[in-house]
Regions:
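Active-site/substrate-binding loop(s) of hydrolase catalytic cores
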Residues: 1-146, 151
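Catalytic cores of processing enzymes, dominated by hydrolases/peptidases
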Residues: 109-110, 139-178
Length: 178
């Protein structure tokens, strides 16, 4: 939806949150990666059969209900697989009895253990990004606070996004901060 709004604003010259996008993009760029976890989306929509070689694992881990599946086909929640607070999340997972692949919140054996996470991190390390935003349509919430690692303008950016998207600014529970 965000990229559609951007394209429409570019075509018509309209504003997004009081910003003329064409002028903005002449000075800056925007990189959009539409979906980091396509197999997870397919599993959530179409069940364990969409997991290919991992269908048995997905079926067993989900007990046949994949409607709330958030992990990749290997049962790793990619939001928990980045090397940003991974050790703390791993500890919280253990405290909640999460030791192995699961529909959500299992961060993998080590940070960037999953090809999706590793490729995204490699791409980001190869670029100079001043800001990074991650959109999650589930819940229609904007998480902007990351403790001591929260960038300076995060709150302001979240306020602009909330005003333009209708999503609520929110703080996730501790185990969901990945």
């Amino acid at each position: 939806r965000f990229t559609s709004q951007m394209a429409a604003a570019l075509e018509t010259g309209s504003l997004i949150s009081d910003i003329k996008l064409g002028d903005f993009l002449r000075r800056r760029g925007v990189t959009v990666i539409p979906c980091v976890n396509p197999d997870g989306v397919e599993i959530s929509l179409h069940g364990s059969a969409a997991a290919g070689e991992y269908r048995e694992l997905v079926h067993n881990v989900s007990c046949g209900d994949t409607s709330r599946w958030q992990a990749n086909a290997r049962g790793v929640d990619l939001n928990h697989n980045f090397n940003a607070g991974w050790e703390a999340l791993h500890t919280l997972e253990r405290e909640q009895g999460i030791y192995h692949p699961a529909p959500t919140r299992y961060g993998g054996e080590y940070p960037e253990s999953e090809p999706e996470t590793r490729l995204l991190c490699d791409f980001c390390r190869s670029q100079y990004f001043r800001h990074a935003l991650a959109f999650h349509s589930q819940g229609e919430e904007i998480y902007w606070d990351f403790g001591e690692r929260t960038p300076e303008k995060s709150r302001l950016m979240a306020q602009v996004l909330a005003a333009s998207s209708g999503y609520e600014m929110s703080e996730p529970e501790a185990i969901a901060t990945g």
